Amino acid sequence: MTLPKAPPKPVVLPTPLTFRESPNQSERRQKPYLIVVHRPVGKYGPSIDWLCNPKAQASAHIITEGKGTGVDVATQLVPWDRKAWACASFNSASYNLEVDDDAWDGDDLGAAFTAARICGFICRKTGIPPAWTTSPLSQPGITRHYDLGRAGGGHSDPTTDVTYWKWFMRQVVREYERGGYRKIWGKGRFQRIA
């Protein structure tokens, strides 16, 4: 698969970003220094339903879905200033994004471009460097759930393909340099980034 250097056309998100607050959240105990990228277990709608179900005991700050149209969908489930339950002992230290399953298979890159823009936005607002950290216990940056190892629950998402991950990180840096996604992202406590 040949990965594009940039989106074929600008990524446009709905205005405003969709919000559906998950009960699966709690107070943060520290300032986040990581962005952790995940791959949901299922498709967009059912994944949102599951992450908003108290029985799941899991959540994320944002979940994205690509539709291959250039207009992609993102829903925020947990306010930025709260802890999402997504990666075990790293929950307080991180912002967590679930990126549509098809993005990591190369079937629909829209969700990956949207997630890159979100990561660029978070990096701009928080000072987290737009760089892949493979030492998430000690270095700030962006990491895969997989990179957290056993301390993050022992997962292999969103991808173990280093070539694809490096491509994704180039998109994050590109969005960071453009200023990230800013004005239309949320109101009230959803807009505040801890």
Over which residues does each language-model region extend?
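Basic/polar, cationic surfaces and motifs that engage anionic cell-wall
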Residues: M1-L17, P23-R29, A103-A194
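N-terminal catalytic cores of peptidoglycan-degrading enzymes
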Residues: M1-N91, G152-D161, R189-I193
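Hydrophobic faces of well-ordered beta-strands that scaffold small-molecule active sites
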Residues: V37, Y95-L97, I142-R144
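Generic beta-strand or strand-like secondary-structure segments
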Residues: H61, Q76, N96, T114-I118
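Glycine-rich, often proline-containing surface loops adjacent to acidic residues and nearby aromatics
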Residues: N91-D101
